[in-house]
Amino acid sequence: MIKIAVCGAAGRMGQRIIVAAVEAGCIISGALERPGHPQIGQDAGLIAGCGQLGVAISDDLNAVVEGCDVLIDFTTPKISLKNLEVCGLKKKSIVIGSTGFTPEERALAAELAKDIPAVLAPNMSVGVNVCFKMLKDLAKTLGDDFDVEIVELHHNKKKDSPSGTAVRMGEVVAEALGRDYNQVANYHREGICGERTKEEIGMQTVRGGDIVGEHTVYFIGMGERIEISHRAMSRDMFSRGSVRAAKWIVGKQPGLYDMQDVLGLK
């Protein structure tokens, strides 16, 4: 059985990952939290609500990584890159679901993953990744005759904007249309800003309440509109996806993979 360690184990996402891993028949070998966290030393299973596992939450990154086959990390880019570096040194696989990576940070992640297999994906949902494939095909079919706008909604605690999933959706569409996403993405419209350019991809964000995550991509033509939407009802789809990725990554060749690789959509 695969031994999985979870970073951010006492958080909402970390708890759901622990539950999903146990349900999938994996072994929870380690549970990591930041130094000084009030739940360090407590049983990770009891914190997650799935019963005692005999695994105490720890702040010792090296020890936690040493004891696992795969580390699952939903934290921040800075923490994830540090964890990726340690996993590389110890030849352990890692699954990263953190969002908010800059292009430079993604490039660094690829460099750090030269010697180990790693999955880096802004969204672990099977449905969202099917949407990525649909968006690519649809953009190629529609071409430049349709304007593209993206709207994403999340809870009021989310720290990054726009979401990593929304950005990836924009990147997929831009790549399919032969555009540079960083050049055509429009995150801000206010006042007299002129007509919309044909190439731009608009990005709008909404933050409020407890919305887990909603994304809609609009392809807007003359007299017609196509919408591709995904709505997350709970975080469990992300946790199950991360465990699926962890089981898939073991034994793979070194390199940086994404959920399209995990799901065989490439």
Swiss-Prot record:
<feature type="binding site">
    <location>
        <position position="34"/>
    </location>
    <ligand>
        <name>NADP(+)</name>
    </ligand>
</feature>
<dbReference type="Pfam" id="PF05173">
    <property type="entry name" value="DapB_C"/>
</dbReference>
<keyword id="KW-0220">Diaminopimelate biosynthesis</keyword>
<feature type="binding site">
    <location>
        <begin position="164"/>
        <end position="165"/>
    </location>
    <ligand>
        <name>(S)-2,3,4,5-tetrahydrodipicolinate</name>
    </ligand>
</feature>
<dbReference type="InterPro" id="IPR023940">
    <property type="entry name" value="DHDPR_bac"/>
</dbReference>
<keyword id="KW-0521">NADP</keyword>
<comment type="function">
    <text>Catalyzes the conversion of 4-hydroxy-tetrahydrodipicolinate (HTPA) to tetrahydrodipicolinate.</text>
</comment>
<dbReference type="InterPro" id="IPR036291">
    <property type="entry name" value="NAD(P)-bd_dom_sf"/>
</dbReference>
<feature type="active site" description="Proton donor">
    <location>
        <position position="158"/>
    </location>
</feature>
<feature type="binding site">
    <location>
        <begin position="8"/>
        <end position="13"/>
    </location>
    <ligand>
        <name>NAD(+)</name>
    </ligand>
</feature>
<dbReference type="InterPro" id="IPR022664">
    <property type="entry name" value="DapB_N_CS"/>
</dbReference>
<dbReference type="GO" id="GO:0009089">
    <property type="term" value="P:lysine biosynthetic process via diaminopimelate"/>
</dbReference>
<keyword id="KW-0028">Amino-acid biosynthesis</keyword>
<comment type="similarity">
    <text>Belongs to the DapB family.</text>
</comment>
<dbReference type="GO" id="GO:0019877">
    <property type="term" value="P:diaminopimelate biosynthetic process"/>
</dbReference>
<dbReference type="InterPro" id="IPR022663">
    <property type="entry name" value="DapB_C"/>
</dbReference>
<dbReference type="Pfam" id="PF01113">
    <property type="entry name" value="DapB_N"/>
</dbReference>
<dbReference type="InterPro" id="IPR000846">
    <property type="entry name" value="DapB_N"/>
</dbReference>
<keyword id="KW-0520">NAD</keyword>
<keyword id="KW-0457">Lysine biosynthesis</keyword>
<dbReference type="GO" id="GO:0005829">
    <property type="term" value="C:cytosol"/>
</dbReference>
<dbReference type="GO" id="GO:0050661">
    <property type="term" value="F:NADP binding"/>
</dbReference>
<feature type="binding site">
    <location>
        <begin position="121"/>
        <end position="124"/>
    </location>
    <ligand>
        <name>NAD(+)</name>
    </ligand>
</feature>
<protein>
    <recommendedName>
        <fullName>4-hydroxy-tetrahydrodipicolinate reductase</fullName>
        <ecNumber>1.17.1.8</ecNumber>
    </recommendedName>
</protein>
<dbReference type="GO" id="GO:0008839">
    <property type="term" value="F:4-hydroxy-tetrahydrodipicolinate reductase"/>
</dbReference>
<keyword id="KW-0963">Cytoplasm</keyword>
<dbReference type="GO" id="GO:0016726">
    <property type="term" value="F:oxidoreductase activity, acting on CH or CH2 groups, NAD or NADP as acceptor"/>
</dbReference>
<comment type="pathway">
    <text>Amino-acid biosynthesis; L-lysine biosynthesis via DAP pathway; (S)-tetrahydrodipicolinate from L-aspartate: step 4/4.</text>
</comment>
<feature type="binding site">
    <location>
        <position position="33"/>
    </location>
    <ligand>
        <name>NAD(+)</name>
    </ligand>
</feature>
<feature type="binding site">
    <location>
        <position position="155"/>
    </location>
    <ligand>
        <name>(S)-2,3,4,5-tetrahydrodipicolinate</name>
    </ligand>
</feature>
<dbReference type="GO" id="GO:0051287">
    <property type="term" value="F:NAD binding"/>
</dbReference>
<feature type="binding site">
    <location>
        <begin position="97"/>
        <end position="99"/>
    </location>
    <ligand>
        <name>NAD(+)</name>
    </ligand>
</feature>
<feature type="active site" description="Proton donor/acceptor">
    <location>
        <position position="154"/>
    </location>
</feature>
<keyword id="KW-0560">Oxidoreductase</keyword>
